[in-house]
């Protein structure tokens, strides 16, 4: 459901990428600045990334089936992973153009219209990035957040290029143009590295952030006075979905119905705090020593009450 709600924002990103790419190419054609050309090349990456994000969100919105019982929400990571690869390719192209211009410099055409077009493209990118960031946070979509972060990097890069071109017009220092283009290339490369690292961490089933782990354990506290204990908390993030599992240890004299009602109440409380979560519980008797023997258990990332009964 969340991925389906995010798709219109991916369409917005595609439209914005097409518009900004046209504006920046127009600015390059007027000024001849390789810095603006590098900025336009990065916009092609934005366009490709937006298209991939739309595809990934469409796939992530596909309901779970017999072959994919946990759903398709991890498809969002295809977007950030491929975006990182696109960014590396763009960085190489930017670096090549900058070195070529550094070795064979030529004067820029002084035209205020070119800079005005670049400023308009930057303003459009900034607005769309802000919209995508808010939507990504609200819908817990890593694809939208990654697209927003990339666009904001593009915004700051564009600001630097526009300022540099203006300075060149004032000072006449033509060598600033390729140097700034190289700086843009390194900035794009850093963005690609950051996105790839985030994607790899997510694909390795990284646990939920500490704040969310604390929200989960806070749901346990009201039941500890009843002699209930909890352990083996395991969490992972998969796109816009969070998967949470833990064991619930209750007194052995409890009925199955009472234990079931307790688990239902806890699962509901967690679902209200963690948007898009799927909670799985395992009920165990508190007095049975085997309930405490789990060789694969590791120290949890958040405090759990694991005290054995006296």
From Swiss-Prot:
A molecular-function term among this protein's GO annotations: ferrous iron transmembrane transporter activity
Q: Where in the cell is it found?
A: Cell membrane
Task: Extract the SUPFAM superfamilies matched here.
Answer: Cation efflux protein cytoplasmic domain-like, Cation efflux protein transmembrane domain-like
What is the recorded membrane topology of this protein?
Answer: Multi-pass membrane protein
Question: Which residues lie in Basic and acidic residues bias regions?
Answer: 285-297
Task: Name the residues that span the membrane.
Answer: 10-30, 44-64, 78-98, 113-133, 161-181
Chain spans, region Disordered:
285-310
**Source species, domain of life:** Bacteria
Report if keyword Oxidoreductase is assigned: no
Q: Which GO terms describe its cellular component?
A: plasma membrane
| A Gene Ontology BP annotation from the UniProt entry | intracellular zinc ion homeostasis
Keywords in UniProt for this one? Cell membrane, Membrane, Transmembrane, Transmembrane helix, Transport
| The keyword ATP-binding appears for this protein | no
InterPro entries the UniProt entry points to: Cation_efflux, Cation_efflux_CTD, Cation_efflux_CTD_sf, Cation_efflux_TMD_sf, CDF_Transporter
Main location class: membrane
The record lists its disulfide bonds as none
Listed PANTHER family: MITOCHONDRIAL METAL TRANSPORTER 1-RELATED
Matching entries from NCBIfam families are given as:
CDF (TIGR01297)
UniProt lists the family membership as follows: Belongs to the cation diffusion facilitator (CDF) transporter (TC 2.A.4) family.
Q: What name goes with this protein?
A: Uncharacterized transporter sll1263
Classification lineage: Bacteria, Bacillati, Cyanobacteriota, Cyanophyceae, Synechococcales
